[in-house]
């Protein structure tokens, strides 16, 4: 686990990559250009800012309003959002609160979620909003993962890889820190401790209030301030393992400053139950010996829940490294 100590951070512009071009199709010169940019950004930072015009102002506003309505529900109601899988249902810890929806790119699954919270009638408007939003992010996720596989010469595994995952859409709320009666200055607190994501790819979108920070390879914390029509695309530990360590999953955290509540969304591509994460032979050679043992994602999550997993500098290496 990375330290929860909050060192100073600096403002920094991560690479911004445009995915809005209508000519962005596999095999096109534009595709090759963007693929090269994606690889460079992920090798350098483990993440990048993606400009994606399908996240319209109207859609972003609708998602924001839906989250306000959802988090205003009583806690016992939100606790109906349950899952047998770790870190998938309703979560609440200190300043952080979150709801999770499996396969939110499928409308029926979102309807099941709203039916949990409104048993009598569900919530058609919220269901349609979350479904449309998730659909758009899934489209971006699929493009990015295809580009990554092509970059490392393992395009023969693309269909197998894309079919081996499902999606979790997470809606997140970070409450502003409590007032300090003895200090008029803005108070800064850790909204979400430093961590790496355990899945394949994460796509994060924050609304109006910033707070996300990413740790660079040289151990500097940088403030991430994407525009309202862009998202942060980030490598997870499972992708790092699949690629035999060719890309890294960056530490990131949320710092709460001031008195405004922060809302954000996350789309997580996750290996399905029973799928074994193992580097293809094409990525293993004398210069790149195999780093990780094959493993199942759920076993990795269960390890992360143990004391050994929580205190490890890298849960992935502690769990799966040779």
Curated annotation (Swiss-Prot):
Residues 165-271 form the Fe2OG dioxygenase domain. InterPro entries: DIOX_N, IPNS-like_FE2OG_OXY, IPNS-like_sf, Iron_ascorbate_oxido_reductase, Oxoglu/Fe-dep_dioxygenase_dom. 2-oxoglutarate binds at residue 262. It is an enzyme of class 1 (oxidoreductase). Its cofactor is Fe(2+). Fe cation binds at residues 195, 197, 252. GO terms for molecular function: dioxygenase activity; metal ion binding. The keyword Ribosomal protein does not apply. Its EC number is 1.14.11.-. Keywords: Dioxygenase, Iron, Metal-binding, Oxidoreductase. Binds 1 Fe(2+) ion per subunit. It comes from the Eukaryota. Probable 2-oxoglutarate-dependent dioxygenase that may be involved in glucosinolates biosynthesis. May play a role in the production of aliphatic glucosinolates. Belongs to the iron/ascorbate-dependent oxidoreductase family. PANTHER family: 2-OXOGLUTARATE (2OG) AND FE(II)-DEPENDENT OXYGENASE SUPERFAMILY PROTEIN-RELATED. This is Probable 2-oxoglutarate-dependent dioxygenase AOP1. It comes from Arabidopsis thaliana.
């Amino acid at each position: 686990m990375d330290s929860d100590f909050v060192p100073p951070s600096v403002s920094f512009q991560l690479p911004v990559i445009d995915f809005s071009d209508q000519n962005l199709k596999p095999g096109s010169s534009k595709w090759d250009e963007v693929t090269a940019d994606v690889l460079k950004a992920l090798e350098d930072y483990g993440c990048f800012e993606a400009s994606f015009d399908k996240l319209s102002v109207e859609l972003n506003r609708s998602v924001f309003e839906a989250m306000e309505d959802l988090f205003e529900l009583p806690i016992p109601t939100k606790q109906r959002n349950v899952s047998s899988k770790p870190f998938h249902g309703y979560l609440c810890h200190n300043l952080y609160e979150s709801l999770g929806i499996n396969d939110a790119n499928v409308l029926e699954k979102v309807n099941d979620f709203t039916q949990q919270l409104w048993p009598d009638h569900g919530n058609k408007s919220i269901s349609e909003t979350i479904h449309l939003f998730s659909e758009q992010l899934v489209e971006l996720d699929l493009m990015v993962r295809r580009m990554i596989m092509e970059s490392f010469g393992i395009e023969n595994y693309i269909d197998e890889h894309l079919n081996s995952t499902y999606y979790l859409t997470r809606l997140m709320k970070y409450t502003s820190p409590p007032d300090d009666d003895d200090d008029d200055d803005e108070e800064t607190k850790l909204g979400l401790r430093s961590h790496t994501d355990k899945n394949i790819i994460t796509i994060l979108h924050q609304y109006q209030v910033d707070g996300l920070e990413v740790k660079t390879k040289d151990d500097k914390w940088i403030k991430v301030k994407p525009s309202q029509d862009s998202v942060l695309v980030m490598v997870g530990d499972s992708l790092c393992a699949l690629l035999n360590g060719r890309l890294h999953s960056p530490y990131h955290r949320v710092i709460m400053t001031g008195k405004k509540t922060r809302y954000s969304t996350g789309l997580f591509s996750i290996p399905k139950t029973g799928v074994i994460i193992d580097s293809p032979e094409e990525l293993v050679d004398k210069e790149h010996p195999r780093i990780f043992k094959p493993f199942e994602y759920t076993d990795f999550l269960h390890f992360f829940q143990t004391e050994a997993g929580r205190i490890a500098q890298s849960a992935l290496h502690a769990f799966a490294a040779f």
